Amino acid sequence: MKFCTTILFLLCALSAFAQTTVYQAFEADSAAEPRGGMPYVTTFLQANLRKPIAAEAQGVGGRVVVMGIVEPDGRITDVKVVNKFRPDCDREAVRIFSLFKAWKPGYKDGKPIRQYVNIPVTFKPSPPFLYENGARVSYFDKDDKLIADSSKAQYKQLVPVDSLGIPSGDIIVYKTKGKVWKEETRMPLIRKESSARGPSGKTEYLIGYQDGIIQWNGLLVRVDDKGAILRQTYFQDGKRSGTELVYHPNGSVSEKTEEFDDKYVTTSWYPNGQIRQIQSSAKQKPNVPTPPDHVLAYWQDTGRQMVRDGAGRAVYQSQVPLPTDTTKYIAFVEEGMYENGFKEGIWKGRYADGSYSYEEQYDKGVCQMGKARQADGTELRYTEVEKQAEFKGGMPALGQFLASNLRYPADAQRARAQGKVFITFVINTDGSIADAKVLKGVGYGADEEALRVVKAMVGRWNPGLLRGKPIRVKYNLPINFTLQ
């Protein structure tokens, strides 16, 4: 009996040894590799890279080589630095490489094994800038042109940012008075609740800067109730500009949207870092129909590529708010074919519990007809998937209504107050108006007058539609008061 026990112990020890042995790539029969291919790992790492502010300020560039162990289940563990650059960048390289967990494990003797993998993480050089006491410092001449020589500057701007470059305080502009800098203007850092709610249903916040007419300018960050970054977008004069990043709850990038002259290109990933999709969207132009989105490639979460060069079948799974309770989410599955990058033929979608479904016919990405079955069994037919709420008669009719009904308050005329009053309101499913309020006003009775006119629009709006069903839509309207 003692002999059998000893054999059993040795077998267990050998099994444990086999499971903990870590192999080099050349020792494997087939080496570990990233799902989707190595080029997409590099794309993922660069999308997630947050160059530390100290390195950014110095403008330095370099390379960190990190090593980890690919486990039999495809996870990456025990990530460490092999070739160092500088401590802050070394830590960042470890962080982002640890986020990628979509590996095909190595195999030896027909079994998955633990295997070492190495990968370089590149930090690109960047224009240096002055960073002091937690703020980015810039100098300008009398014509507001950026200059490097502070002794010739008329203005100094301080932009407080944290170690990741996220806004952390008011932007302050100083003007020189002899040898003394005195505060000239200040742009407060705005932190306010977002009207949107994520899958968690918890409050989200917007952090950024707004100008005098409530337009966002610079970096706008959306965070959750614990401060984790959910989205970051750059704005210029209230319009999105440059690159936008959206994050998964685990901190990895879920979408990266890059801006080009005539389009946006969006690359998306699964939570484990596996690439999901590459698509382009045309920029909207006034009075010109926007062409449908163009999908170049799509992968399943297993790494299998389903759409290649714009052709193939895609199956999308997402979480969407329940119509009956927007704080709760349900799985939504959509599937269909792509040809030349556009939806083609029959596309279908359904809730996981079967309470809602749709079927649509596409030609070159344009919906020709669709039908949606509601939870109560009713069927809605439509030709446009999504239709915005609109004033009956269009924008010309809206302009005429404002011109005919808006009155310039006497107090505002006497004070020679003029400008735009920004009103926000909700257009209900029956076209009625609710929750009208002033976002930014000019005072002297103009704000109240703008509200009065908006509330007088009852019955003059067509509601927004989603697959034939009326939906509530939030609408922002600027109303101009100008003295002749």
Show where each model-derived region lies.
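Positively charged n-region of N-terminal signal peptides that target proteins for export
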Residues: 1-4
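Glycine/tyrosine- and acidic-biased, solvent-exposed loop/turn segments at the edges of beta-strands
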Residues: 19-23, 39-42, 47-50, 87-88, ...
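Extracytoplasmic
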Residues: 61-65, 76, 114-118, 418-422, ...
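Mid-chain, structured segments of secreted extracytoplasmic proteins
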Residues: 67-95
